[in-house]
Amino acid sequence: MASLLIFPHLHHFDSSLDRREVLVVRHSQASRRFLTPKASINGSGITNGAAAETTSKPSRKGRKKKQTSTVIEKDNTETDPELNPELADYDDGIEFPYDDPPLVCCFGAVQKEFVPVVRVHDNPMHPDMYSQWKMLQWDPPEFGRAPGGPPSNVAISHVRLGGRAAFMGKVGEDDFGDELVLMMNQERVQTRAVKFDENSKTACTRVKIKFKDGKMMAETVKEPPEDSLFASELNLAVLKEARIFHFNSEVLTSPTMQSTLFTAIQWSKKFGGLIFFDLNLPLPLWRSRNETRKLIKKAWNEANIIEVSQQELEFLLDEDYYERRRNYTPQYFAEDFDQTKNRRDYYHYTPEEIKSLWHDKLKLLVVTDGTLRLHYYTPTFDGVVIGTEDVLITPFTCDRTGSGDAVVAGIMRKLTTCPEMFEDQDVMERQLRFAVAAGIIAQWTIGAVRGFPTESATQNLKEQVYVPSMW
């Protein structure tokens, strides 16, 4: 099975197929002592560390009786870690030897997408069919399987950029689920927090543009296991080791995943991690606009770092802000030079205009406009990083799939390597240019996973796009 692959940089792992607890043995020069496990694969098995030290030999590895989930379900209703006694008392005494690069945990759903085969197939079609590419978009002859899901894409892109990432979610125990986990293992993404569901199938999304109304339609197998991850199935070992907890707004569409998400956020804050909210707003997935704003606002107030697009920001603010940006007069309409100095050729929302969305926990807000501009806001300064225009989509050469995920992965990569970027505006802009370069390369290549760049390629493009003083 794909979930049983072991990487050499892992000392221990939690398997979803083998639910026995794993004891971590630490050697010292004076003596050998056994420590209690940090957390079992089902969330139970948390014991007192002092009692384990007095034991002369480890306990048997027999299957233990599963504890009740009354305490863990109570965690789902709590939003403040200080009010939860289990969060305050939890301490397994285990330290992680790998601190560089820090681990990033990506929480959410991983799916199999079926996209037109003319983009992803290894054997391209006849060259004469290139002239009919416009019609192939409306009526593709075949569909090919492609890994999808923003959390898994961000995890893979983060590893490509030189970081360490772990995916936390659930898949079905079928061919699709095995293939997705195997794909992440091949990309060196840790999958010890992945759960397998025997009673449901992995979600499959069939993407096709309907010629009738020109809208994107998605057919999904329900109920997928991605929407049924419970709080008792969280891997606390991964949450403790991760320095950044990343999640996407799509998990808010499932009531079960909502409670599990906020429980995971509580644990991550308890362990000192940063909360990264990647807003993804396909409105057809939501029931109503008011419910969308309400759920996003709840997750928004828990996040330390947020990434949104310009259209998503205007949706959360109000339609009046869209009209203000639309009526903005650029600098090339200025009547004299003094007006040119005070105007820009684009609209940048001021901190006063986004004041209604700001809260005390928020450290960084990034507003993307494709790869053309990245607007950033911190409690002390704000500004814009200029990139390049989005590429033109052509057959068999490039697409924009996964570009936003690459930008998010680039931001998280620099957050782990340069924590002081919150304090210096010049350092902030230099690090965000790296994220812009990652998004540009993802646009230039076909597909999401195949198009994610490496750290060296991203740095090389950054040095080509910007002058040396901006590196």
From Swiss-Prot:
GO terms under biological process: chloroplast organization; plastid transcription
Signal peptide (residue range): none
CDD domains from the UniProt entry: bac_FRK
Transmembrane segments: none
Compositional bias of kind Basic residues: 58-67
Pfam families, alphabetized: PfkB (PF00294)
Transit peptide: 1-38
Coiled coil: none
Record Gene3D superfamilies: 3.40.1190.20
Keyword check for Chloroplast: yes
Residue spans of biased composition, Polar residues class: 39-57
Gene deletion effect: Albino seedlings leading to lethality.
Keyword Chloroplast applies: yes
Localization in the cell: Plastid, Chloroplast
GO terms under cellular component: chloroplast nucleoid; cytoplasm; nucleus
GO MF, one annotated term: kinase activity
Keyword annotations from UniProtKB, A to Z: Chloroplast, Kinase, Plastid, Transferase, Transit peptide
Record-linked PANTHER family: FRUCTOKINASE-LIKE 1, CHLOROPLASTIC, HEXOKINASE FAMILY MEMBER
The protein's role, per its UniProt record: Required for proper chloroplast development, most likely through regulating plastid-encoded polymerase (PEP) dependent chloroplast transcription. Acts as a component of the transcriptionally active plastid chromosome that is required for plastid gene expression.
Subunit organization: Interacts with CITRX/TRXz. Interacts with PTAC7. Self-interacts. Binds to FLN2. Associates with the plastid-encoded RNA polymerase (PEP) complex.
Extra remark: RNAi plants display abnormal plastids lacking internal membrane structures.
Protein family according to the UniProt entry: Belongs to the carbohydrate kinase PfkB family.
Name of the protein in question: Fructokinase-like 1, chloroplastic
